[in-house]
């Protein structure tokens, strides 16, 4: 829960200001920072909360009992996923991302442990890699087109922003793959 609280500073602090106005790009006009910070706090909290509940319900259905550890990994997964898009999505996008994160973390942790036979005692791959990857792609799906980010596929932006996000994750994966050899 400490990490959940700290992500308000991490994500919210990225807005640079919590109140007042700042000069817009190019020195023309002003923009209100309070509304952006409030949106960032709301989407961060909603995604994490929904991911926690979905991970708990998913494990309860799958294993016939709730799994506290997996539920808390769901919290972290939601926080990781929403970090990429928290300033450019609405509450609906945050809710959908939370659902995706809650299911993805359980499935990827199980895949790594049982299929790949890799010892990942804290589920770091499922929490950070899988949900970071998916969260970056979700920008291209759920972005509302605000704050300098193009609109996502489901918000009338077509495939442009999705293509940019996919190029980004492929480039990072290639870079990591090459440098880890």
Which stretches of residues belong to each language-model region?
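Glycine- and aromatic-enriched membrane alpha-helices
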Residues: 1-181
């Amino acid at each position: 829960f400490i990490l959940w609280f700290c992500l308000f500073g991490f994500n919210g602090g990225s807005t640079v200001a919590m109140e007042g106005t700042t000069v817009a790009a190019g020195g023309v006009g002003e923009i209100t920072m309070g509304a952006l910070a409030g949106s960032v706090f709301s989407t961060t909290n909603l995604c994490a909360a929904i991911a926690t509940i979905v991970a708990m319900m998913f494990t309860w259905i799958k294993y016939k009992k709730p799994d506290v550890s997996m539920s808390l990994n769901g919290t972290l997964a939601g926080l990781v996923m929403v970090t990429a898009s928290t300033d450019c999505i609405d509450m609906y996008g945050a809710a959908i991302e939370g659902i995706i994160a809650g299911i993805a973390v359980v499935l990827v942790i199980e895949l790594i442990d049982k299929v790949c036979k890799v010892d990942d005692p804290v589920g770091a791959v499922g929490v950070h890699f899988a949900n970071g990857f998916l969260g970056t792609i979700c920008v291209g799906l759920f972005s509302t087109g605000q704050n300098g980010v193009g609109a996502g596929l489901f918000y009338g932006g077509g495939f442009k922003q999705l293509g940019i996000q996919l190029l980004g994750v492929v480039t990072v994966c290639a870079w990591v793959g090459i440098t880890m050899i």
